[in-house]
Amino acid sequence: MATRHQVRQSVVSLLYANEMGSEMEEFSNEFLEEKKIRNDQKSFTLTLYNGVLDNLNLIDEALDAHLGKWKLGEIGAVERAILRLGAYEIKFTNTQSAIVINEAILLANELGSDSSTRFINGVLDAISKVN
C-alpha cells in the first residue's frame, strides 16, 4: 500500500502532467496503477488532485498574495504543483499545517530545484498563518 507521502508525490506528478497538457483521465489511471496506488489511497490521491483543480483560482490567489516579487507563472512547474497542493491542503482540508509544510519540503527536496525548499516553506508558512 502506498504511503501518504507517495500519494502526494503522485498528486504533484498528476498536477504537473495536467499543466503540460496530458490526456489526464487515461494517464491518471495508468500512472496510479503503475505506482501501485489503489483503493483508499487512490481515492485520497484523486480527492487531493481534483480538489486542487476545483479550487485552482482560490489557491492561485492565495499563493499570489505571498509570492513577494515572484509571479506564479515564473516559478517552475514542479514547484508550482507542490505549492498548489500544499495551499489546497492548508486551506481546504483538516490536515495540520505543520504536516502539510513538512510534506511540501520533502517533495521539494525530492522533485524541485535546489533553491525551492526554503521558498516553498516560506510561502506555505505565510498562507498557514492567514488561515
Curated annotation (Swiss-Prot):
Function: Involved in transcription antitermination. Required for transcription of ribosomal RNA (rRNA) genes. Binds specifically to the boxA antiterminator sequence of the ribosomal RNA (rrn) operons.
Taxonomic superkingdom: Bacteria
Any one annotated GO CC term: cytosol
Record keywords: RNA-binding, Transcription, Transcription antitermination, Transcription regulation
An annotated Gene Ontology molecular function: RNA binding
InterPro entries per record: NusB-like_sf, NusB_fam, NusB_RsmB_TIM44
Name of the protein described by the UniProt record: Transcription antitermination protein NusB
Pfam family for this entry, one: NusB
